[in-house]
């Protein structure tokens, strides 16, 4: 933008600057946003990136009448739809990696809406405006104010095409972005907080800002989020632990790195499975192998075989909203010929949890749901603390990490004999 502003003062220098900037911007765009529109770093980083991107693109279009091919990139055309579906019915996002769940007003959703003539894209922005959740000091989120609102005035420019009544409700119940580095499938029965929302991811840990969370999922229903992803500790806390213990590099994403010693970054504290207490393979790429769009089974299937570090012969997880009524996960795991597979099936939750005869009972407000696992293998249900010292897998950095007494991990353990196949069907239903 500086090159545009000072072009008349020094045309040669500014022209060289613009040529390099346009070329590097296209390369950078493709590095961040996949061909399917997804950002492998998640929604929080996408918002930061896309707002700067839109300022550049808008400046080029205003000055030269063209964005020099940026908007022709397929991923660019799809990325706003990806973000729309990553926001759950509660107004919180599906989080993975270093992201948090807060969601801000995103002025660029109005830009994309006008550019691609899609009045569904700013759905959550319009909802926030109607509910008075637009805050002068920052964004909107059910838990407080987050990012700066310095770009809000751009809404006046980018939203001018539509009247308020022109924005419409998205109609697709299932959305899939399966070609990116962190593939996702999202299913929802509707768009109100009472409706159900499911998201599941694949991917790998050897990526910027990633966690060992392939196979993780998020589930909302009946006005509450039941399966979540806890907010991580501040970088400074973990960096101090790594430095004081002299145990490596926090930003090394390879297998065995100090990064995976952090309590809330390793696979045991995410809504996925671990086998034989082993970490995931940081290079193991879990791909979405099926997307189901039928009302009777909305969701997707992810192959976790490469993720589980050779501990099993194969592992496939299907997550669906069944008959638009309840959540169902089906994990089909084949043990190696020479060893048992001791599986820990877990997820983080802010609900009150107790073990009952039928499984796990989770309560939030006046709503209670029941988690039950059906399998031929013996099931041991459990509740584990969100405390690096008291968890069943204590953290190497526990003296530096935050202890949270009101958050829990819950799930179950299953032991699969060598060479055997075990199918585990887990449901979460309202009681």
Please identify what each model-predicted range represents.
Residues 19-33, 193-197, 208, 310, ...:
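Active-site-adjacent bridging/hinge elements
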């Amino acid at each position: 933008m500086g090159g545009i502003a000072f072009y008349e003062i020094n045309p040669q220098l500014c022209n060289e600057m613009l040529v390099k900037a346009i070329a590097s911007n296209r390369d950078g765009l493709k590095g961040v946003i996949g061909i399917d529109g997804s950002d492998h770093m998640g929604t929080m980083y996408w918002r930061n990136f896309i707002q700067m991107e839109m300022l550049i693109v808008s400046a080029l279009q205003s000055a030269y009448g063209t964005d020099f091919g940026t908007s022709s990139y397929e991923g660019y055309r799809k990325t706003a739809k990806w973000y729309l579906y990553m926001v759950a019915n509660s107004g919180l996002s599906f989080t993975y990696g270093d992201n948090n769940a807060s969601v801000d007003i995103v002025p660029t959703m109005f830009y994309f809406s006008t550019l691609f003539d899609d009045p569904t894209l700013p759905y959550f922005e319009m909802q926030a405006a109607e509910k008075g959740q637009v805050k002068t000091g920052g964004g909107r989120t059910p838990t407080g104010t987050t990012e700066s609102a310095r770009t809000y005035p751009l809404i006046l420019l980018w939203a001018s095409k539509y009247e308020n009544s022109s924005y419409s409700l998205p109609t697709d119940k299932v959305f899939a972005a399966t070609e990116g580095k962190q593939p996702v499938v999202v299913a929802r029965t509707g768009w109100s907080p009472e409706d159900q929302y499911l998201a599941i991811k694949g991917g790998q840990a050897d990526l910027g800002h990633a966690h060992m969370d392939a196979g993780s999922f998020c589930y909302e229903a009946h006005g509450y989020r039941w399966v979540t992803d806890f907010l991580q500790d501040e970088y400074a806390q973990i960096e101090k632990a790594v430095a004081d213990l002299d145990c490596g590099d926090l930003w090394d994403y390879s297998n065995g790195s100090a990064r995976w010693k952090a309590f809330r970054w390793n696979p045991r504290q995410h809504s996925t499975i671990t086998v034989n207490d082993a970490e995931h393979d940081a290079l193991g790429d879990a791909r979405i192998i099926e997307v189901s769009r039928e009302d009777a089974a909305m969701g997707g299937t992810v192959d976790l075989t490469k993720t589980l570090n050779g501990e099993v012969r194969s592992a496939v997880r299907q997550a669906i909203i069944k008959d638009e009524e309840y959540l169902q996960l089906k994990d089909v795991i084949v043990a190696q010929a020479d060893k048992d597979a001791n599986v820990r099936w877990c997820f983080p939750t802010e609900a009150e949890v107790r073990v009952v005869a039928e499984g796990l009972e989770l309560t939030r407000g006046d709503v209670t749901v029941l988690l039950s696992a059906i399998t031929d293998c013996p099931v041991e249900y459990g509740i584990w603390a969100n405390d690096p010292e008291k968890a069943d897998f204590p953290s190497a950095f526990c003296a530096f990490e935050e202890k949270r007494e009101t958050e829990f991990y819950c799930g179950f353990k299953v032991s699969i004999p060598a060479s055997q196949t075990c199918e585990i069907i887990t449901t979460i239903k309202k009681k």
